[in-house]
Amino acid sequence: GDAVALWRRFGFKSHVHFMVNLRGADPASDIADDRRLVTDPAFLPDEGKRYPGCLVESARLTDCYEAGQWRPYTEEELVGVLVADVLATPPWTRISRMIRDISATDILAGNKKTNLRQVVEAAVDATDEAVAEIRSREISVEGATVGDLSLQTIAYQTATTEERFLEWITPENKISGFCRLSLPTALPRDTANESSPPPI
C-alpha cells in the first residue's frame, strides 16, 4: 500500500499486475486477494493486469511442480477466478490484459490459450450479471450520438486521495470517454511541513 500511496501523491496513474495461481495460493485465496485489491483504500488501482501463473522450463517453480508442491489450476478453476475478478472490479478500473506473451511451446504447465480473455468474457456474459469494469463497457467501434451521452461522476476515497471518476456514457451504460481527477488529502511530511516552495 505504501508504494501506491506514494505514486498517488504525485499524480501518477496506478497500474497493478496481479498474478493468480502462485505457489501457496488456491482459487479461494486468489479471489479474496483480488477483493482486497479492489476494495481496500490502500490500493484501488486505476488499471490492472491479471496474469495466470504458468510454468516455463527455466523457472525455479519447476522443482515445486515435480515435487507436487504446486499445480496449475484447471481451466474451470482459472476461468472461475477471473470471472469473479471481473465481476468485482469497480467502474473506475480497467483490466487491460489477462495473459502474458509467452509462447505455448515454452509453457510446461498452465494456461496455453491465447484467447483466454474471450473465454472469460463469454463466461461472464453467461452469468447475466452487470459488469462495471471499464474495458467491458468501452464503446469501441460502436457509434454514439453526442446528445445521447450523459456525464456521470463517481466519487471514492483512497488512503491518501479524494478521487473523482468522470465518465461520459450512453443510455446503455457504454463509456464514450472518461477523465480521472485526484486531490491529495495528505502530503509527504517533508513536503507539507519542511520544504519551502522554489522561487519563481
Residue ranges of each PLM-predicted region?
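A short, polar/charged loop-to-alpha-helix boundary motif
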Residues: 187-193
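Conserved C-terminal portion of the radical SAM core fold
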Residues: 2-60, 76-102
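Short, flexible, glycine/charge-rich loop motifs used to bind or transfer phosphoryl groups or to couple energy/partner
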Residues: 38, 156, 191
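Short glycine/proline- and charge-enriched loop/turn segments
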Residues: 62-69
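Broad gene-expression machinery/nucleic-acid interaction feature
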Residues: 47, 163, 199
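Acyl-donor binding region in acyl/amide transferases
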Residues: 1, 194-200
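C-terminal accessory regions of radical SAM enzymes
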Residues: 69-182, 186
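Aromatic/acidic cage segments in peptide-binding pockets
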Residues: 56, 183, 196-197
